[in-house]
Amino acid sequence: MIFDAIQEWFQELLIDGIISNLTGMFDTLNTKVGEIAGEVGMTPSAWTRGIFNMVRSLSETVIVPIASIVLTFVMCYELIQLIIEKNNLHDFDTWIFFKWIFKTFCAVLIVTNTWNIVMAVFDVAQNVVSQSAGVIISDAGIDISGVTADLETQLADWSIGALLGLWFQSIFVGLCTQILSICIFLVIYGRMIEVYLVTSIGPIPFATMVNREWGNTGQNYLRSLLALGFQAFLIMICVGIYAVLVEGISLSGDNISGAIWGCMGYTVLLCFTLFKTGSLAKSLFGAH
């Protein structure tokens, strides 16, 4: 009699522990995946206003003067090229000075409006992400609250050994889930920090844009901006694929162990694809 009471108490303890572990695990996953859609859809100005103002101030007060020096050198080099390219001054036309003045005007216009150009790129990317959010499944999580009662009833028929094994599995997978949630955090926040770092030095590569030989620096910088902006769209696609995959997971008593490992497998796959979005976006836009 006492043994049966102890066994029943231990069984209830294991069931409560399993339900608690599963609820915490799936809630953590749902929260982190939900944060992805919210974070990547923000522009640099909306993500953290304090960091945005600091980066903009540094760019305008420190980087723009350096970009002015680079621009002066580049345009002097451009003028020399325009003069000597016509048969070593034997075929000299005065119109090249108008061409040089026009190029200089364009270069100065680009450098002085670098911040507007950079923010426009991310505004376009943010608009794409916002539109895609209406198409991609927004509920990228598993609702365990609706099956908790049925799950407890089904687990009540399990033996102590089976419950103990499932309890250890839920603890291990829960720890792995915490690690994976940190990986998701690193991808999302790492991308935003990279955005701020890249935007802060924008005037310098833009200062080389109009020169034929040095222009590749500015063009590659612009491609890098596009890659960073549209990386958010690729991240949204990853979240959409993850949502479709986890939607098919069945949380039943007979399949609860497979559901736990399946969910962790899909989360590992999500983390892997999130880490790949940066290099994929750069390869698509030809940035290096």
Language-model segments: which ranges?
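Hydrophobic transmembrane alpha-helices of secondary-active transporters
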Residues: 76-83, 202-212
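Hydrophobic alpha-helical transmembrane segments
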Residues: 65-77, 195
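Gly/Ser-rich, low-complexity
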Residues: 1-70, 86-95, 105-176, 215, ...
